[in-house]
Each structure stands twice: as structure tokens, then as C-alpha cells.
Amino acid sequence: MTKFKLKIASRRSKLAMVQTLWVKEQLEKNIPDLEVSIEAMATQGDKILDVALAKIGDKGLFTKELEAQMLVGHADIAVHSLKDLPTNLPDGLTLGCITKREDPSDALVVNKKNKIYQLESLPPGSIVGTSSLRRLAQLRYKFPHLDFKDIRGNVITRIEKLDSGEFDCIILAAAGLKRLGFESRVHQIIPNEISLHAVGQGALGIECKSDDKEVLKIISVLEDKVSSQRCLAERSFLRELEGGCQVPIGVNSSIQNDEIALIGMVASIDGKRLIKNESIGNIKYPEEVGKKLAEKLKLQGADKILSEIFEQFRDK
């Protein structure tokens, strides 16, 4: 029997390859007559390491090159960390599948001399590394006495910088640490009361051509309904605010019975203004819950905060 061949476009970073190999293994496990290959490549976000992500100002920093491969027929699907995938996709492409989500929380990772501290007890002036404006804004709001410094590079590079003494601690996604085998380095899971996570954090998104019914059917075996409902609500919230992956917008979602609850926040980069609200609705209509939450935050001034941020980076 001739096997159906499927090619995956992936970033070549260690974490991206771990995630893509998991997708490959799961697809081949569920569909025995499927032969999956991987084309790994560097994206713009992987290449530009000397500039803060937000200053590059592109919503497709980690996805455009993968999408281009699909659009010209060189790849059938692309595997993304869902938090990196823009909410508005190129014509002809769709988010075909959302996998079962890992813990979406942020995690505190410390060097040896700071193991006695939690985030709340770090001494004034402690150097905290993060490349995320979302984390930066929320932590500045809660802990203005700490010193925040941009950190770039993959997870392993960031941990090496931490251990060399360049930082007292760094903030990373708990899911990425777990997937790379660094779960033991999670010193503290940061509570939602301190830092709401990124939209889609902890889940993988599989993108493909909108009209490729055969591929859509194949990848549907990895779809997790609960994770999908939560992430669709979160992505709708982000889309309605016209925010990208690099702006200070955070969320948390939960499902109970037939309802989905969504908490969201928008903050200024300096941490001096932070607005938060929540929305609850029917689990059948997750995107409506996201839209309602965005509307609430707009009434509280979210548009003004975000426009100031966009203007700030436009001038640089």
C-alpha cells in the first residue's frame, strides 16, 4: 500500500523540533499509512537576536517563513507554539487543529544564589530577565522595585545566561520548560493574580491550507476540544483588541460545566496602568466570550494604552 506523505514546516529551534517531532509521532501512531517528514528552517524572530521582539514590530515573527512554504506547496502543515501564531492568518491558510494544552502558566527560574526567594520576596534591584512585554508590564505593576532586563535566545541559551550570573532570575513558559526536560528548573509557578499568561500559551497550533480537506481530516485526530474552546476564546479576545503576540495583553481561561470564563488584562509597558476584567458565556460560543471581554476592556481604556504602545515602537 502506498503511504500518504505529509510534510511539516517547523522552526529549527530545539523546542520547536521537540514539539514538531511529537506531532509527527502522534500522527503516525494514529494513522499507520501516513509517512511524515519535517522541513526545519529559521524564521525572522530566530535570526534577529540583538533587538527586543516588540521593537521588530512584526506579528508573524516566528511564522511567516513556515506559512510561505505551505502557500507555495512545499509543506502541508506548520506546527507552531500557538502563542506565536497571529490571530489573523494569510488568505488560504487556517488554524486546522489545537492540541491538548500543557500548563499555560509562566514560571520563575532562578540561579543558585536566589533559591531562597520567591518572586514576591526577591530583594530590591534583583535583575529579572524577560523578552515579553506582557510579563514585563505585569511584573513592573506588582514589583516596581525589581530591575527588568531584556533577554533573547532560545530556552537553553537563556538558562545559560541566568546560570552565568547575568540575571538573578528569568521568566519562561512552564510548558516549554517541561517539553525540553527542564521541569526541575521551575522554581515557582507564577500565580494568575501576578501574571496572566499569553494567549494560547501551552498549546500547539497546526496550520494548513484552508481548502485541503484531506490534511484537515488527518490533523483532526490531534484536536483537543477543551483546549480548543479555551484558546479560541483567548484568540478572539486578542483579535478584537487588534493586538499582536508581543504586546502586553494577558489572559486566563477556565471551563466549568457548560460555561467558559475568561479573564483578560491590558497594561502599559511601564507598569503604571493595568486594567483587568472578565467575561463568562456559553462554551458553544467561545469566540463571543472573547469579543465581550475585549469590549469591556475597551470601555476601560484599553485602546488608548495599546495605541500609545504602538506609537512608542513606531517612533523607534
From Swiss-Prot:
Pathway: Porphyrin-containing compound metabolism; protoporphyrin-IX biosynthesis; coproporphyrinogen-III from 5-aminolevulinate: step 2/4; Porphyrin-containing compound metabolism; chlorophyll biosynthesis. It catalyses: 4 porphobilinogen + H2O = hydroxymethylbilane + 4 NH4(+). The keyword Transcription does not apply. Its EC number is 2.5.1.61. The modification S-(dipyrrolylmethanemethyl)cysteine is found at C245. Transmembrane segments: none annotated. Its cofactor is dipyrromethane. Keywords: Chlorophyll biosynthesis, Porphyrin biosynthesis, Transferase. GO terms for molecular function: hydroxymethylbilane synthase activity. PROSITE patterns: PORPHOBILINOGEN_DEAM (PS00533). InterPro entries: HemC, Porphobilin_deaminase_cofac_BS, Porphobilin_deaminase_N, Porphobilinogen_deaminase_C, Porphobilinogen_deaminase_C_sf. It comes from the Bacteria. It is an enzyme of class 2 (transferase). GO terms for biological process: chlorophyll biosynthetic process; protoporphyrinogen IX biosynthetic process. SUPFAM superfamilies: Periplasmic binding protein-like II (SSF53850), Porphobilinogen deaminase (hydroxymethylbilane synthase), C-terminal domain (SSF54782). Binds 1 dipyrromethane group covalently. Tetrapolymerization of the monopyrrole PBG into the hydroxymethylbilane pre-uroporphyrinogen in several discrete steps. Monomer. NCBIfam families: hemC. The porphobilinogen subunits are added to the dipyrromethane group. Belongs to the HMBS family. This is Porphobilinogen deaminase. It comes from Prochlorococcus marinus subsp. pastoris (strain CCMP1986 / NIES-2087 / MED4).
